[in-house]
Amino acid sequence: MATPFRIKRSAVPGKGPSVSDLQLGELALNTYDAELYTLRSRPGIGTEVVKIGGAAIENVLYVNKDGNDGNSGSTPADAKATLKAAVGIASEGTAIKVAAGTYIENNPIKVPKQVSIVGDSLREVTVSPQNADEDMFHVSPGDMISELTFSGTVDKGIAVIAFDPDKIQYVNQSPYIRFCTNRVANSIGLKVDGNKAVGPFKSMVTDSYTQYNVSGIGVSVSNEGYAQIVSLFTMNLDEAVACHSGGQCDVTNSNSSFGNYGLVADGVGALQ
């Protein structure tokens, strides 16, 4: 006979059941924390108490392939389906956690100030653009994008990551791109246009950014913008790193394989 369906309750903050408190098929509800528990039994592994869903954590949003953009995004069980929907409700200080899967996004995605977008793993989280004639991400000061693979094809000169040309902001903390892979053909992996930002540096920072964007550009720095580049690895690009009109960059521990040009510089800025 099946175990009856039961719910045990506690109103003590932070209290959860132990294995001995539950039978298989029983649920335990903490009414203070709004958290639900049950038993999981796996042959050869054992029996343990697991939390179902989980309570919302302030300033953390979730995206997964089972989500819905009508959801709140505040828990994995109530996740958004797209990065754009999560970014659309993010505020300063928000972290967006993206689960494994392929996400086709209505770009550009305009990321507010001081927001982090972090994937489960760059090998398992892929983001592709719907619109070949639009940049993928427009970033703001203090943003971080990490553990994502960008894939697809865009028009020549379109950027994966760039400053927002529609909202020029003072850069007091550089956007940071780390542990990402760019496979978007023809794209500019990182576009630092100093005309689209204000401040003493007008800068972006990147670490461990691998680029296989055939016929594209790895990092473009122009109009007295600045980039700090660490561990940039490019393959089959037209130009790995290009500085124009007074753009400057520091490049450390990086490599350009195949392609046409490793380093390109032309033009001068207004400042000497």
Residue ranges and their predicted role:
Residues 13, 54-85, 102, 120-123:
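Right-handed parallel beta-helix/beta-solenoid
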Residues 91, 104-118, 126-172:
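Extracellular beta-strand-rich solenoid/capping regions of secreted or surface-exposed proteins
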Residues 11-22, 71, 100-104, 131-132:
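Surface-exposed ligand/attachment interfaces on beta-rich extracellular proteins
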Residues 61, 96, 103, 109, ...:
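Solenoid scaffold repeats with emphasis on beta-solenoid/beta-helix
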Residues 1-27, 45-54:
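Extracellular/surface-exposed low-complexity repeats and stalk/linker segments enriched in Gly/Pro
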Residues 94, 106-108, 122, 126-134, ...:
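Short glycine/acidic-rich loop motifs that flank beta-strands on beta-rich extracellular proteins
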Residues 21-38, 61-64, 96-98:
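Short hydrophobic/aromatic-rich beta-strand motifs
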Residues 144-226:
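Right-handed parallel beta-helix
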